[in-house]
Protein backbone atom coordinates (compact mmCIF):
# COMPACT_ATOMS: atom_id res chain seq x y z
CA UNK A 1 0.00 0.00 0.00
CA UNK A 2 1.10 3.55 -0.71
CA UNK A 3 -0.05 4.78 2.70
CA UNK A 4 2.09 2.21 4.49
CA UNK A 5 5.12 3.10 2.38
CA UNK A 6 4.66 6.84 2.94
CA UNK A 7 4.11 6.39 6.67
CA UNK A 8 7.26 4.26 6.85
CA UNK A 9 9.28 6.90 5.00
CA UNK A 10 7.94 9.68 7.24
CA UNK A 11 8.61 7.69 10.43
CA UNK A 12 12.12 7.04 9.13
CA UNK A 13 12.90 10.62 8.10
CA UNK A 14 11.46 12.47 11.10
CA UNK A 15 13.97 11.14 13.70
CA UNK A 16 16.85 11.73 11.28
CA UNK A 17 15.71 15.31 10.66
CA UNK A 18 15.29 16.01 14.38
CA UNK A 19 18.71 14.49 15.09
CA UNK A 20 20.30 16.61 12.36
CA UNK A 21 18.74 19.81 13.69
CA UNK A 22 19.79 18.94 17.24
CA UNK A 23 23.38 18.20 16.22
CA UNK A 24 23.59 21.41 14.18
CA UNK A 25 22.26 23.51 17.06
CA UNK A 26 24.61 21.75 19.50
CA UNK A 27 27.65 22.38 17.31
CA UNK A 28 26.74 26.05 16.89
CA UNK A 29 26.27 26.30 20.67
CA UNK A 30 29.67 24.73 21.29
CA UNK A 31 31.39 27.12 18.88
CA UNK A 32 29.76 30.11 20.52
CA UNK A 33 29.53 33.41 18.68
CA UNK A 34 32.95 33.18 17.06
CA UNK A 35 31.52 32.30 13.65
CA UNK A 36 28.60 34.41 12.52
CA UNK A 37 26.62 31.98 10.38
UniProtKB/Swiss-Prot annotation:
Pfam families: PetG. The chain crosses the membrane at residues 5-25. Keywords: Chloroplast, Electron transport, Membrane, Photosynthesis, Plastid, Thylakoid, Transmembrane, Transmembrane helix, Transport. The keyword Membrane applies. InterPro entries: Cyt_6/f_cplx_su5, Cyt_6/f_cplx_su5_sf. It is found in: Plastid, Chloroplast thylakoid membrane. The keyword Transmembrane applies. The 4 large subunits of the cytochrome b6-f complex are cytochrome b6, subunit IV (17 kDa polypeptide, PetD), cytochrome f and the Rieske protein, while the 4 small subunits are PetG, PetL, PetM and PetN. The complex functions as a dimer. Belongs to the PetG family. Component of the cytochrome b6-f complex, which mediates electron transfer between photosystem II (PSII) and photosystem I (PSI), cyclic electron flow around PSI, and state transitions. PetG is required for either the stability or assembly of the cytochrome b6-f complex. This is Cytochrome b6-f complex subunit 5. It comes from Gnetum parvifolium (Small-leaved jointfir). The gene is petG.
